[in-house]
Design a protein with these regions (language model features):
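Sec-dependent signal peptide recognition
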Residues: 2-7
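C-terminal motif of bacterial Sec signal peptides marking the signal peptidase cleavage site
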Residues: 12-15
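N-terminal capping segments
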Residues: 26-136
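...with weaker cross-activation on analogous glycine-rich loops/strands in unrelated enzymes
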Residues: 138-210
Length: 251
């Protein structure tokens, strides 16, 4: 009886330790960028295939996870994989691709790309199941709601860029966000100490660039519609499971 009691106590503390480990991993979900890559490596098709394989591996683990905590642990891992793939693998191929209002090329540096198509195409190529044509053709606020998967987007009016940067640094987690402006869209990359704007720049037809948001002439706007990408658990799950992102359209 005494041995049974000891074994029961050991099993109890082991179980608590396992749960504590998962809880710690759940809360330690910050996305970190040791460096921002601006140079593509290898071929675009090979880069997509490599990370789609990693996505499938994570999806299998997610489907086989038996508890909510275990699933959340995989979601947290997927956040970092997605952020790394989008910012440091997929997007670098697009730097230098020229802007055009009607541009919709699907091949980096060949042809031209409008701001909405830059976002929708890179989201599709990073593994989201989304209609890149339909998403790119919507108003900035509807694009944001489509990506957020709800009406619960952050709308900021009449804020100076420097104040928006300070808001992000103080209140937002590191990661990638969609941002819609008055007549423009792109990505925001929030790191520990900086806010970057990644977009197909219409000014002087510059095309796809990454800029410090505070220094970007194209980032000035009366309104900002912000949707979370890499810290959006529901969106990450859809990415893993290849579920369709429903595009919100103007009625």
């Amino acid at each position: 009886m005494k041995l049974f009691f000891v074994a029961l106590v050991i099993a109890f503390f082991y179980s608590c330790e396992q749960d504590a480990t998962l809880i710690n991993k759940k809360t330690n979900d910050a996305i970190s960028f040791n460096a921002i890559n601006r140079t593509p490596s290898g071929s675009y098709s090979a880069a997509k295939i490599k990370y789609l394989a990693k996505k499938k591996e994570l999806a299998s683990k997610y489907n086989n996870a038996s508890t909510k905590l275990a699933k959340q642990q995989i979601i947290n891992e997927a956040k970092n994989v997605l952020a790394e793939q989008l910012v440091n693998v997929i997007i670098p191929f697009w730097y230098g691709t020229k802007w055009s209002f009607d541009g919709y090329t699907s091949t980096p540096t060949e042809g031209e790309i409008a701001c909405g198509y830059f976002v929708s195409t890179t989201l599709k190529d990073v593994g989201f199941n989304v209609n890149r044509y339909k998403l790119a053709q919507q108003r900035p606020d509807l694009e944001a709601k489509s990506i957020q998967l709800s009406d619960n987007i952050k709308t900021i009016n009449n804020m100076l860029v420097k104040d928006l940067k300070n808001y992000f640094l103080k209140n937002k987690k590191n990661g990638v966000y969609f941002v819609g402006l008055d007549f423009h869209v792109g990505y925001l990359l929030k790191t520990q100490n900086e806010l970057f704007f990644i977009h197909s720049n219409y000014i002087n037809n510059a095309g796809v660039v990454i800029e410090i948001a505070e220094n970007s002439r194209a980032f000035s706007s009366n309104v900002y519609y912000i949707a979370d990408i890499t810290n959006n658990n529901q969106l990450i799950a859809k990415w893993l499971l290849n579920e369709t992102i429903k595009v919100r359209i103007d009625q």
